[in-house]
């Protein structure tokens, strides 16, 4: 590539040696505040003015033996050298400087990142911006929008200014994009055109043969995501070994086998040059992309981005494409998600991609803020100024940007597991944790059963999420691969393949829209479901060491004792209050203020959460739910919901007919649960439960123990009773009916095993499933240890249990075939 240099000759040796330097080139951060310079900045910016070239160069002082300035520490770099430079001499300084008058003071600005010697004649001839700067001050300032572009500015921008040819094939797309921004900011049109031409050449040369559709799908089939357990190659259904990919469209010639392998390998690389070039151009600032040589380049990159991400589900499995999408600017991400040509099997993929984008943006903003705070602390410790929050600093999405992002999802087309926008789906329960999305989620569902009822009762605003109510998120993050917990949404977004494929394409227009779909989406027949992922696991298993169980039992026992003390105190105070009322205000009662502050009734034992759950790290997806194993310790009365089920939560005293799906075994389990409301025997529950991401209020309502304020309002059921107050029985029944959609009515597993590593003094710890659990009709979905508080709280029992090598005895459970 032949590029006209800014200077007609190669003057780069002068830049390396500092010969005839008569000015300085200062690199600064454009995002730093203007008042970032204080008195200590004199260490970076020497106050000495540039000296004029002497009349007799032969009598000049010898050059300084010190190294070239590269860290901003001041040294005298302005003394001319006794050499003749290409038949020219440096321009003499102004008369004021020659007469001993100081040069014009530098304007207050950010601290320099780097200071190098410069030459006025070269800089002034290269750019009108440098010419204007050197006419009023002693330094040529290069402002960087991003500090990461400092190497490109120091090595490439100055090399072009001084006439050194650049090695264009060796430059990465990110470096070329940085050169585009630097050349646009410093009025170097030749460098800008050369960088734009190189990026266009990369996009044309690296584009997959025959279009990115087949190549992206083939690369996605060959990528082993972190969720594949155990790691395995692509199955025949995924287009792997044993199944040949269909031929590309007739319009494009079929590439050779070797070329196809190269394309797939390039897309599977961690850093793809083609994807990096697209992302670098799309990420250009608006003022740079909309002017000069970047106009056509930016338009081409946007078209290629939509082309590569058109088959969105296949592109999401390619690491380079997924990383490129998560790093896009918000306008580009909105253009991708809102594109009418985006082909997905269900709208849940788009919703989870939006969640992943917001999570990534928030995480990177937090990391950037932490880095800025660290730099500010280092600057304060060194006497310098702080780091400012300029326009280039990444920040989380505000409310308007979040609404724009999630507005790209067509919620009325949301299909999950064959159902349209129901509450008992994993995606709906996950997304509803964001309060600002409630109005968007209820769009188009005013008459869709539970969604419309809750929207009418709560005014479109959901219940406030409880931070400690969803401990399953930690297990979900741990099950999603070797990622940090803060990136759990990124990992959960990769699980979109578990949703049922309904072939609900976003493109509209019947047969005319088929031409806009990617080739892999236009194949005959439904898209095969991926295999090898976590949701296709045939079993769940969980190991809990006895040491962990012992600690959990101690914590639960302490909570139960504390709750019992509070309960006795409250009962005694209420008895005193009643005696005081009957005695006509005699002595011995409680004060009126204390009596008014006391609750009207003692809370039932089953309504107080004292249990502790140990959740397994593995998940299995089936029938719209994520299933997980859990070992829970607590009083028996706290497991009424698991024993009776939400369908039998309505009290039998209401006189209404039983629900049609209530079997005799379920009714018997409900009666047994009511009889055990005061049973505080400590038990160990081992079983399977759905991961619903519910709040505490929702779980309590599903258990029939309470109704959230938004679910049974003033005008709700039973409102025309005593003074407009809702009847308690009717409110509980209404809450249980609403919550019945959130929980499965009955759960079955094909195999359920719980065992120990050895026998214990009182027999095997796992003696269930007990007859009480059998009566619930759950057929092996749970086990209640037949060891009451006398055994679980016995020190001798645990001393024998943990007496193995390093206390490694465990309770092991395994289930298979969850229904």
Curated annotation (Swiss-Prot):
Keywords: Coiled coil, Cytoplasm, Cytoskeleton. Residues 546-580 form a coiled coil. The keyword Nucleotide-binding does not apply. InterPro entries: SKP1/BTB/POZ_sf. Residues 46-72, 564-590 are annotated as: Disordered. It comes from the Eukaryota. GO terms for cellular component: centriole; cytoplasm. It is found in: Cytoplasm, Cytoskeleton, Microtubule organizing center, Centrosome, Centriole. Residues 46-59, 572-581 have a biased composition (Low complexity). This is Proteome of basal body protein 15. It comes from Chlamydomonas reinhardtii (Chlamydomonas smithii). The gene is POB15.
């Amino acid at each position: 590539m032949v590029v006209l240099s800014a200077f007609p000759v190669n003057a780069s040796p002068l830049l390396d040696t500092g010969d005839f330097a008569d000015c300085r080139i200062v690199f600064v951060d454009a995002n730093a505040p203007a008042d970032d310079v204080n008195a200590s900045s004199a260490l970076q910016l020497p106050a000495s003015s540039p000296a004029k070239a002497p009349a007799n160069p032969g009598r000049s002082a010898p050059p300084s033996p010190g190294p070239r300035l590269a860290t901003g520490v001041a040294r005298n770099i302005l003394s001319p050298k006794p050499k003749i430079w290409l038949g020219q001499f440096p321009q003499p300084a102004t008369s004021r400087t020659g007469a001993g008058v100081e040069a014009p003071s530098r304007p207050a600005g950010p601290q320099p990142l780097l200071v190098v010697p410069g030459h006025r004649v070269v800089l002034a001839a290269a750019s009108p911006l440098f010419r204007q700067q050197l006419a009023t001050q002693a330094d040529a300032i290069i402002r960087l929008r991003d500090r990461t572009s400092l190497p490109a500015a120091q090595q490439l921008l100055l090399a072009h200014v001084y006439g050194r040819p650049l090695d264009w094939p060796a430059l990465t797309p990110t470096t070329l994009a940085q050169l585009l921004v630097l050349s646009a900011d410093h009025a170097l049109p030749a460098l800008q055109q050369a960088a734009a031409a190189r990026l266009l050449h990369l996009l044309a040369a690296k584009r997959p043969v025959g279009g990115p559709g087949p190549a992206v799908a083939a690369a996605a089939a060959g990528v082993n995501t972190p969720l594949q357990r155990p790691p395995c190659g692509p199955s025949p259904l995924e287009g792997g070994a044993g199944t040949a990919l269909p031929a590309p469209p007739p319009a494009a010639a079929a590439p050779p086998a070797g070329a196809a392998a190269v394309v797939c390998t390039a897309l599977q690389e961690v850093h793809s040059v083609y994807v990096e070039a697209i992302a670098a151009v799309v990420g250009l600032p608006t003022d740079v992309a909309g002017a000069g040589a970047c106009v056509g380049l930016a338009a081409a990159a946007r078209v290629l981005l939509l082309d590569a991400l058109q088959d969105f589900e296949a592109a999401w499995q390619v690491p380079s494409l997924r990383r490129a999408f998560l790093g896009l600017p918000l306008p580009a991400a909105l253009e991708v998600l809102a594109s009418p040509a985006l082909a997905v099997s269900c709208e849940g993929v788009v919703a989870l991609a939006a969640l992943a984008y917001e999570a990534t943006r928030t995480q990177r903003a937090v990391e950037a803020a932490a880095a800025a705070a660290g730099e500010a602390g280092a600057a304060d410790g060194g006497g310098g100024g702080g780091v400012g929050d300029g326009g280039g600093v990444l920040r989380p999405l505000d409310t308007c940007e979040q609404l724009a992002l999630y507005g790209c999802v067509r919620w009325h087309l949301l299909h999950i597991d064959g159902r349209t926008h129901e509450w008992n789906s994993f995606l709906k329960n996950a997304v509803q944790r964001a309060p600002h999305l409630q109005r968007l989620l209820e769009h188009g569902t005013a008459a869709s059963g539970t969604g419309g009822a809750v929207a009418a009762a709560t005014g479109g605003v959901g219940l406030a999420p409880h931070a400690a109510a969803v401990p399953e998120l930690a297990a979900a993050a741990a099950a999603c691969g070797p990622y940090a917990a803060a990136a759990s949404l990124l990992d959960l977004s990769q699980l979109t393949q578990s949703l049922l494929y309904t072939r609900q394409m976003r493109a509209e227009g019947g047969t005319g829209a088929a031409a806009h779909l990617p080739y892999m989406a236009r194949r005959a027949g439904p898209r095969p479901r991926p295999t090898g992922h976590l949701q296709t696991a045939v079993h769940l298993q969980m190991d809990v060491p006895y040491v962990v169980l012992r600690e959990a039992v101690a914590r639960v026992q302490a909570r139960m004792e504390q709750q019992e003390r509070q309960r006795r105190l409250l009962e005694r105070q209420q008895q005193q209050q009643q005696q005081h009322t009957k005695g006509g205000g005699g002595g011995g009662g409680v004060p009126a203020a204390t009596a008014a502050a006391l609750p009207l009734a003692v809370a039932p034992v089953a309504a107080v959460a004292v249990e502790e759950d140990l959740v397994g790290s593995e998940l299995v997806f089936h029938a719209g739910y994520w299933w997980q194993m859990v070992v829970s310790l607590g009083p028996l009365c706290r497991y009424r919901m698991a024993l009776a089920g939400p369908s039998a939560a309505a009290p039998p005293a209401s006189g209404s007919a039983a629900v049609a799906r209530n079997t005799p075994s379920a009714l018997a389990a409900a009666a047994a649960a009511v009889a055990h409301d005061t049973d505080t025997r400590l038990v160990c529950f081992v079983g399977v439960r759905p991961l619903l991401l519910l709040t505490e209020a929702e779980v309590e309502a599903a258990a029939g123990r309470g109704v959230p304020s938004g679910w049974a309002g003033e005008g709700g059921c039973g409102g025309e009773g005593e003074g407009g107050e809702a009847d308690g029985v009717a409110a509980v029944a209404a809450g249980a009916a609403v919550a019945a959609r959130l929980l499965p009515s009955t759960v079955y597993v094909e195999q359920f095993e719980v065992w120990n590593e050895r026998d214990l003094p009182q027999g095997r710890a796992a003696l269930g499933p007990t007859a009480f659990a059998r009566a619930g009709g759950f057929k092996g979905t749970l086990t209640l240890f037949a060891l009451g508080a006398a055994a679980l709280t016995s020190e001798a029992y645990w001393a024998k249990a943990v007496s193995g090598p390093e206390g490694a005895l465990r309770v092991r459970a395994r289930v298979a075939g969850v229904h």
